[in-house]
Amino acid sequence: AVVLVGYGIILPDGSHLLGEDVLNGAMILILVTCVVSSFVTESTARKMLLQRKASADMPAVPADAPDRLLLAINNPDTIVPLVNLTLMLRTPKSVVPPLALHVVLEGDPSALQAGHDQLQKVEKMAAAANVEIETFNRWSVNVVSGISHTVKENAISDLIIGLHQKQKLSESFYGKLGADLLGAVERQLLIYRPIIPLNTVRRLHLVVPGKAEFEPGFTQWMHRVGLLAQQISCSVEVYSTAPTLTSIERQWERQKQTVIALYHEYHSWNDLLPLAHNVRLEHMAIFVCARRGTISFHSYMDRLPNQVERCFSQRNLLFIYPSQPATESTAKAGLRTGLPINVK
């Protein structure tokens, strides 16, 4: 405003009190400060949030904490490995039975019987393991709506689905269902791709992004991974930044979970090939991911699906998207529904 006033003052010789160079410089200064201030504000807000969360001790997950696991099934070929994973992730002595869901589209009533048969198979497997399980054959206008409503109605803590099996090159890694669920469900989402039976896995490779310890779902997914390692009696190799590795080790001690773990400082997120060389056929890779706009989200996660597809084609895979309540992450729906994947 001052520059514009000065530019509008005409001197006796006909020139402006403040010339065009000053006016252009002021405009450039305003542009630069507006751009820089937005990045500085975001960076400062993140640092303040990290400092506040770092000052508070992370609570341990009680051994008797109620489980509210929901297994969403659709493919009859993956029922057995998905049920086995669900049973192994269930906290011992939990009084809350896991749930199994099959969604029937309103325009496809013929799928009702197929869903009933699949749920019966789930019940038989759970009964053989002496575990009670509740099953639902639910009508809905679409699969995502049916699953998300079930999650909310039953206060689900963990949603388990199978990884999409690509039929065309144009399809995305997670598939339309997985991508839509990431935006619709705020609870912890586990996406599993089985290659070999889970009880034959000899080692877990856990890949964790830096600053994951500051996310609200940190203790929850650590509890699940610890349970899985105990159930199949295998060791865990953890890959992350040094501060996050320290937090992971302390958290397992706090939760009093006996986990045999080796910790590796790892920064080569843009190239997972060195890590893939360590993951043998009898091993399983677990990737802890993050939704866009959260503290632990990094730009390399946009390329993660393509790298995993190229480097881990014949390995058991488990992708974990930690619980991220809207009140903790952001009030903007655009950030909550942003997906760290390449949807084609």
Please state what every model-predicted region is:
Residues 1, 13, 119-123:
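N-terminal secretory/membrane-targeting helices
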Residues 30-49, 154-197, 277-344:
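Gly/Ser-rich helix-loop-strand patches that form or flank binding pockets
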Residues 47-64:
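Membrane-proximal cytosolic interface modules of multi-pass membrane proteins
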Residues 14, 54-55, 174:
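Short secondary-structure boundary micro-motifs
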Residues 2-44:
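Structural signal for the N-terminal portions of transmembrane helices
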Residues 59-278, 286-289, 293, 321:
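Structured cytosolic domains appended to multi-pass membrane proteins
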Residues 31, 40, 55, 66-68, ...:
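Signature of alpha-helical transmembrane segments and their immediate interfacial
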